[in-house]
UniProtKB/Swiss-Prot annotation:
InterPro entries reported in the protein's UniProt record: BlueCu_1_BS, Cupredoxin, Phytocyanin-like, Phytocyanin_dom, Plantacyanin
Phytocyanin domain sequence ranges: 1-96
Species for this entry: Cucumis sativus (Cucumber)
Binding-site residues, Cu cation: H39, C79, H84, M89
Recorded GO MF terms: electron transfer activity; metal ion binding
Protein name listed in UniProt: Basic blue protein
Disulfide links within the chain: C52-C85
Length: 96
């Protein structure tokens, strides 16, 4: 399945609650739609998600229309533009 992160609003502030109530499976695609001049998508670990810090070597997506295939287990994504993750621009997704 393909999921548009944030729905019609796209990847933006206060998307932290977007995954609630959805069932994700390994191999599902998350589609992140955003303005690449204003946001990005960074794959982080749980610590990076909690603290909004980007771990060294983290994968960064910047196209504005990123398709990311979910691995099994927990995945964490943030925007690391200053202050954005702190404003709820982050999601944690568990794929079965």
């Amino acid at each position: 399945a393909v999921y548009v992160v944030g729905g019609s609003g796209g990847w933006t502030f206060n998307t932290e609650s977007w995954p609630k109530g959805k069932r994700f499976r390994a191999g599902d695609i998350l589609l992140f739609n955003y303005n690449p001049x204003m946001h990005n998508v960074v794959v982080v670990n749980q610590g990076g998600f909690s603290t909004c810090n980007t771990p060294a070597g983290a994968k960064v997506y910047t196209s504005g229309r990123d398709q990311i295939k979910l691995p099994k287990g927990q995945s964490y994504f943030i925007c690391n533009f200053p202050g954005h993750c702190q404003s709820g621009m982050k999601i944690a997704v568990n794929a079965l």
